[in-house]
Amino acid sequence: MKTIYYLFLLLFLLDCKDKVKPVDEQPPNPKEFLRSYVKNPNPNDRMCKDDIEQAEKDLEKYKNIYVTTSCFGCKTSPYADEIIEYAAKQKIEVINDIYSCVVMEGQTKGCYKAMIDLKMEEIHGKDFRHKIEHAAEQLMIQKIKTGTKILSVYDLSEEDQPNLVKENKFTRKEDILTVQTGLPLQHELDTYPFIDISFIVEKDGTISNVKNENWVSGFKRNEKYKNELEGLAKNKILTNYSKWKPGKYKNTLTRVENNFRVCFK
């Protein structure tokens, strides 16, 4: 089943890649283009007109709306949960607008958010979204300080990510580790069984919560070694990769979920 899943994922990515518009075909400022465009969309732009119609219905239903967006491969804000939490307290409805990777000629995506944003700015001013995002970020920072918020390593800029301490020096982490097992593992060319291990880099640079996130045997006969290989992977990380310079978010020390892929030979 996992082989089928990864094959499907690869095909999906390639399909999306084929359908993405070249950069030079995009408007110079998509945000401002949409704000102007929704006021007078092309009559044949069914996608945009449907989005505008839905936005108008939601504006009748909810007094205040904050629109989030999501798409395959899009980066999520580290304080996305706090936006929802803050918005609920302020009686602001959070609605997620999902963008498809498929581009249809003459059809425009993003009109729903543009329409809602325009209306909210008319009522609350140009900084409507900024105020919500700033409040949510401050809420997240408070959680970071108390240790109740764990950020992903991918939420941080490169200079703020945890750095591995080796021989009393800070080094960049190796994304893929290799363990020589001595076991009769089945493999093909450079394809070996692997396991994705996650762990938390604490504020004091130690690690905790080491766990298996994903196991790929490569071949059925390797399944019987799963528990043994998982133990080897965790032991290697706990032994050789347990000292870190902790991560930071805007100069605030934070707990960070990090990860390694461990391959077995």
Predicted regions and their residues:
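Bacterial Sec-dependent N-terminal signal peptides
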Residues: M1-K31
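Charge-biased low-complexity segments
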Residues: P22-K265
